[in-house]
């Protein structure tokens, strides 16, 4: 059984990005990412801090907008507009979730698709579906890299994605399809979830329920990717998969922490470089 090491693989990607950034800088091309955070949600603050640290490591400038909780929709839209128009900014990231009084969809739609390094804009999603160049959502793209760099063959394999969110489940299915996997998407209305999961050569779980998937959902020799992240009753991080029960049955599995998590930020850095290469002045 192989433990897929997301820390190691994400570091490889960041080192590759760092080299690309140095090369672009040598050609006089700087890269900058605008990070917009509204309010001081503790989890969001940790993510923002990690993104800034990654930017610093690879040589991308990060421009921070830390806005108070009571920021209005108009004020937020004005900052997005300012970043859209600033030729020095290559990527715009709005840290989600936003406070309840703000319209997330309107804000994400307002981001210039050429700067949509999160890959959430409908234009980016459309490009992903038809296989055009553009930004891929960071977490699902990170999962594909984990599989490929761990020597897991996707082509022709039975792939099951548990969860159909716009951020992970749906794009995950699309990216596995692009790699010629035979993909099934499961959700709360799926009948016989256990039986469907047991068909999977590659099982990707993003269901948002701690330790939901145990060994009865997994066939011998499957590859299991756990996208979930929760804090359990002992104040320890755990995923959607009951790791201790499932791991012995698998041929490869991602742990939580140290699996999918670190990949998301590494792929964000990769998207910032893509932005400069595809659309930079």
What kind of region is each of these model predictions?
Residues 31-39:
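Short beta-strand segments enriched in small/hydrophobic residues
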Residues 33, 55-69, 183-185:
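Short beta-strand elements in bilobed, periplasmic/extracellular small-molecule ligand-binding domains
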Residues 93-154:
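Anion-binding alpha/beta catalytic cores of soluble intermediary-metabolism enzymes, centered on
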Residues 104-121, 125, 228-280:
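Rossmann-fold NAD(P)-binding glycine/threonine-rich loop
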Residues 40-52, 134-223, 227, 236-247:
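Glycine-rich phosphate/diphosphate-binding loop of Rossmann-like nucleotide-binding domains
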Residues 39, 63-73, 188-190:
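Short beta->alpha junction loops
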